[in-house]
Amino acid sequence: MTALSALIEQKLQSLGTILCQSFPELSPEKIHEAIQQNSNHPELPVYQLGYAIAMSDFVEKVLQKYPHLVKQWWEKSPCFADCTAYIERLNKELANVHDETALYQTLRQFRNIEMAKLSFCQSLNLATVEEIFVQLSQLAESLIIAARDWLYHQACAEIGTPMDEQGNPQQLYILGMGKLGGFELNFSSDIDLIFTYPSQGETSVENTNARRSVDNGKFFTRLGQRLISALDEFTSDGFVYRTDMRLRPFGDSGVLVLSFSAMEQYYQDQGRDWERYAMIKGRVLGAQTKDPNVSKLKKMLRPFVYRRYIDFSVIQSLREMKGKIEREVRRRGLKDNIKLGAGGIREVEFIVQVFQLIRGGREINLQQHSLLKILPEITKLRLITEQQFHDLRESYIFLRRVENILQAINDQQTQTLPTDEIDQIRLVEACKTFTCLNENNQTIEKHYPIENWDDFYRTLQQKQEKVRAVFTQLIGDEQDESSQTDSQWQDFLEADFEDIEQTLLESSVSENNIDEVLEKLAQFKDGLNHRVIGSRGRDVLSHLMPTVLALIFEQENYRTLLPRILNIIEKISSRTTYLELLLENPRALQQVIELCAQSQLISEQLAHYPILLDELLNTEALRHPLPFTQYPAELHQYLLRLPPDDEEQLIDALRQFKQATLLKVAAADILGALPVMKVSDHLTYLAEAIIEVVVNLAWKQVSSRFGVPEHLQNNEKGFLVIGYGKLGGIELGYKSDLDLVFLYDAVESQTTGGKKVIDSNQFYLRLAQKIVSIFSINTSAGVLYEADMRLRPSGDAGLIGCSLSAFSHYQLNDAWTWEKQALVRARPVFGESSLKAKFEHIRQQVLSASRDIEQLKQDVVEMRKKMFAHLSHSKHSEFNLKTDRGGITDIEFIAQYLMLANAPKKPQLTKWSDNVRIFDDMAEAKIISQTDCDTLKQCYVDLRNTIHHLNLLGKSSVVEDSEFVKERSFIQAFWDRLFVS
């Protein structure tokens, strides 16, 4: 008996109890006898039932949950013809559904049973590979549209029917993206959707219980939220589909549903290459052929995706996307991933879609959604050869067969080959023979010489190698092809210390440093001996180290550089992927050497988080950093690769994005591509982009439990994050904390509208706590930012958040002078524009309130004395750039005093929160001279620049007392003019 036969019999026996219940006229003995007699006859239903559950644990679970299916399938096997007419059958079932609980149950039961049928047909080759993923797509589309229509009618009855300006009813249109849009859905895939509606307007409340109309945007947002819950929420019956909305304009930061015109405006003004790539698959679900709005939507999106000219610019964009995927594979340690790995499904998709983007504007036949329909079209255009066409088509079908069998085993979204022996047997069985369509759309039986796992793995690798070869020929990659040169360090890993010493003597290393260098090399080799490094890793290391050491000893500061680089190499020595990255990318290795030579901070980051090495592949990008205004969009795209409901992965990804961006900024700083003011701009706007995502993530977590405060409109949050200190002053450094205050605009006695109702104030406090938790939790990727909340009203004794009205009252009536000083450097970094305006009004009101100038001077001087006593611990021969007299803190206090002293007469002076522009305003208002203004600014920039570079070197902000003598003298003299004379 084969392993599969034994598994079939075992699985059938496990259904014995259900069979007894389904056939009361049969005893357990007779059922066992029937199994024994029929389980070796592939044409009989009993065998087919056993085979289907042997191939899929998911099918077995469905049969256990719905016992009536066991009887049906025992007597008559499902056939592919049963897997049709989904929308008609669904609508018939939903006609008797009267509440959302029943809707959820009906959708999930229908989905599970139909998916089990498709798995049955797939396992028994009752349908081709292509037919399976088309039918999976049609099932998903039917479930989405049936749920939408049911919820739409419910919403219309509750709050009215949305109308356009001409009085015509409006519908929610849904774009199915990705594989759903291309009729290529996986067995257990997420669905990527975008919601839209034709035009602005409001609901008609005739024949409803609604008291007033709402605008169409609010109606469709509510409908969209309910639809997502109906599909995505996990109940006792499971879920329908994991639903991902992040491909919509502005991603998680954007409104859930846009009108046609707003969507058109977005893609015209802000659409990016990756969004063009995604929109190739965009298809209107449930589209009626005569619906003019469907035609309008398609016509609107077509020019964005398909350009009228031949567009070769996309090749580099797609190459970069592919590079990001490869870095992601390395980051997550993905092995044997048939989707993202070399020669995987994604590379076939890239090849096809690059031609669609380049030539689709001129070649109408390329404007289709299905990959298998596009492949012959690009062959006819001679964009690929006949051989490349055959290789890609055959490999793609094989890979998709593997993917769907894998996912059908347990209804899990995986593309990684199994290590479990039973699952390996299943894949071997499924891939040796299966049905598919040939190039003429005729059903054929495909046979492969696969009898065991080794055969399967070899066949899979052959397919992937063919895909990779075509991908490299057509699109190429970013690797530098320069070869490694031999050097005097060729045998370093095997050499004894006498040979190494001789090599050092022959090199540029000073004789006085030989012993020190030898000791460091000995420690490194000893460290390698205590690490688990496979034979492949040893081989890569033996080729890499000669180049590394040769480059190190070319540098003047090799004594400090050597331990930094050796530390990185030792940390990644057991991770062959990163060793190969440095070996195969000489420019990246050179970049590591150059940056670590000038920055202890960068070397420590690379040693702690080797994933950052990927960021050094594009050396040109380091000299031309991304504009800081693009950080929100870049972060959004970075997070798209993750499941939207996996908080742990998102929290880690935020930290990785921050570290990667910090590295790029530091590199650009070292390479002279960024002046100090721009460094702080980049670090500040990076923090703001992260704050936005953190707030949205926290909001999602808290609102999923409690709902949202009922007074909020549409996509509002009623929540402000105020940045104080260096964040507020747009002056963040490499190691800066975030000084934050949380404010909210709550209505008294209002509650949330979720399943668990709480007071709105309590909701915002929980939101604030969640935000701080996301920032401060220490994961394997470190802490995101240290969030300092002590500047909130009443400091540590106060609540973690407070209402705008309470904040205003506190600042006007109870705040100390030092709190008003802090308010000078405060500005909103997250929130709706209307709330930001309210805060700015409060800030101006507080800062421009009349005050006793002598008392103000006394308070500022006293606070400076306290800070000096508390923070300054430098020796007489040292100068602390931040805290000592004549340093950064004095300049900040001068700016704060000037604003507090002069704003009562000139409220316009409160406009800025950063020191440089405050001084500019003071000079323009003739409060200080232009010469003093320029000198203060120059001193400030020079001190900050030095602090930045000390941070990069891993040093504190303390320098020798002989430095900055002129600057300190000026600052102290200016201080005395303000506060002493």
From Swiss-Prot:
<protein>
    <recommendedName>
        <fullName>Bifunctional glutamine synthetase adenylyltransferase/adenylyl-removing enzyme</fullName>
        <ecNumber>2.7.7.89</ecNumber>
        <ecNumber>2.7.7.42</ecNumber>
    </recommendedName>
</protein>
<dbReference type="GO" id="GO:0005829">
    <property type="term" value="C:cytosol"/>
</dbReference>
<keyword id="KW-0808">Transferase</keyword>
<keyword id="KW-0548">Nucleotidyltransferase</keyword>
<keyword id="KW-0547">Nucleotide-binding</keyword>
<keyword id="KW-0511">Multifunctional enzyme</keyword>
<dbReference type="InterPro" id="IPR013546">
    <property type="entry name" value="PII_UdlTrfase/GS_AdlTrfase"/>
</dbReference>
<keyword id="KW-0460">Magnesium</keyword>
<keyword id="KW-0067">ATP-binding</keyword>
<dbReference type="Pfam" id="PF08335">
    <property type="entry name" value="GlnD_UR_UTase"/>
</dbReference>
<dbReference type="GO" id="GO:0005524">
    <property type="term" value="F:ATP binding"/>
</dbReference>
<dbReference type="GO" id="GO:0000287">
    <property type="term" value="F:magnesium ion binding"/>
</dbReference>
<dbReference type="InterPro" id="IPR043519">
    <property type="entry name" value="NT_sf"/>
</dbReference>
<dbReference type="GO" id="GO:0008882">
    <property type="term" value="F:[glutamate-ammonia-ligase] adenylyltransferase activity"/>
</dbReference>
<comment type="function">
    <text>Involved in the regulation of glutamine synthetase GlnA, a key enzyme in the process to assimilate ammonia. When cellular nitrogen levels are high, the C-terminal adenylyl transferase (AT) inactivates GlnA by covalent transfer of an adenylyl group from ATP to specific tyrosine residue of GlnA, thus reducing its activity. Conversely, when nitrogen levels are low, the N-terminal adenylyl removase (AR) activates GlnA by removing the adenylyl group by phosphorolysis, increasing its activity.</text>
</comment>
<feature type="region of interest" description="Adenylyl removase">
    <location>
        <begin position="1"/>
        <end position="479"/>
    </location>
</feature>
<dbReference type="GO" id="GO:0047388">
    <property type="term" value="F:[glutamine synthetase]-adenylyl-L-tyrosine phosphorylase activity"/>
</dbReference>
<dbReference type="InterPro" id="IPR005190">
    <property type="entry name" value="GlnE_rpt_dom"/>
</dbReference>
<dbReference type="GO" id="GO:0000820">
    <property type="term" value="P:regulation of glutamine family amino acid metabolic process"/>
</dbReference>
<dbReference type="Pfam" id="PF03710">
    <property type="entry name" value="GlnE"/>
</dbReference>
<dbReference type="InterPro" id="IPR023057">
    <property type="entry name" value="GlnE"/>
</dbReference>
<feature type="region of interest" description="Adenylyl transferase">
    <location>
        <begin position="483"/>
        <end position="981"/>
    </location>
</feature>
<comment type="similarity">
    <text>Belongs to the GlnE family.</text>
</comment>
